[in-house]
């Protein structure tokens, strides 16, 4: 019915980077079916991608000479986090919502919270290479080279070959 049509069209909009239209379609589903997990997840993803796009455009916007860098707007990801939390309320083992939430925490500078959320992801599924990779990068950021090395090695074993280059570059003891 309508739900499938909105899901398909919303997903197409998402792939075409037409985030506002995707958000409209996923929101239309949620008006009728507030617990539709796919619509909730895709709505949160669309918001996150839209914010990332806005931020990337903002980064390329010419600034007035001497303008303070602090003038750059801080993205508020609270709606995105709320969307992923709503997914987890419906299905507490929905690992993709947790994974995306961890990435949002990292983008938002909430490093410890991101690491803990990646820990939850890996407790649910020990074979998500990207979770090891991303957590490994956060460990590098926090100066925990041994933990970073272990995570990046695991990511490499699971198929992210570039993880080995990161180890060579950042995890060597000086």
Task: Describe these PLM feature segments.
Residues 2, 36, 94, 128, ...:
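Residue-level recognition of tetratricopeptide repeat
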Residues 49-82:
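Short coil/linker segments at helix-helix boundaries
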């Amino acid at each position: 019915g309508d739900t499938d049509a909105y899901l398909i069209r919303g997903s197409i909009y998402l792939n075409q980077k037409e985030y506002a239209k995707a958000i409209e379609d996923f929101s239309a589903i949620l008006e009728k079916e507030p617990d539709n997990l796919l619509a909730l997840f895709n709505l949160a993803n669309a918001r996150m991608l839209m914010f990332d796009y806005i931020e990337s455009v903002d980064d390329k916007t010419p600034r007035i000479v001497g303008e303070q860098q602090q003038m750059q707007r801080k993205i508020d990801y609270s709606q995105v986090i709320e969307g992923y939390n709503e997914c987890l309320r419906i299905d507490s083992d929905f690992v993709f919502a947790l994974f995306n939430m961890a990435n949002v925490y990292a983008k938002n500078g909430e490093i410890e919270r991101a690491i803990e959320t990646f820990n939850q992801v890996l407790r649910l599924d020990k074979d998500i290479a990207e979770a090891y990779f991303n957590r490994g990068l956060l460990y590098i950021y926090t100066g925990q080279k041994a933990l970073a090395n272990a995570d990046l090695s695991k990511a490499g074993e699971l198929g992210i070959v570039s993880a080995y280059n990161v180890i060579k570059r950042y995890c060597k003891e000086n």
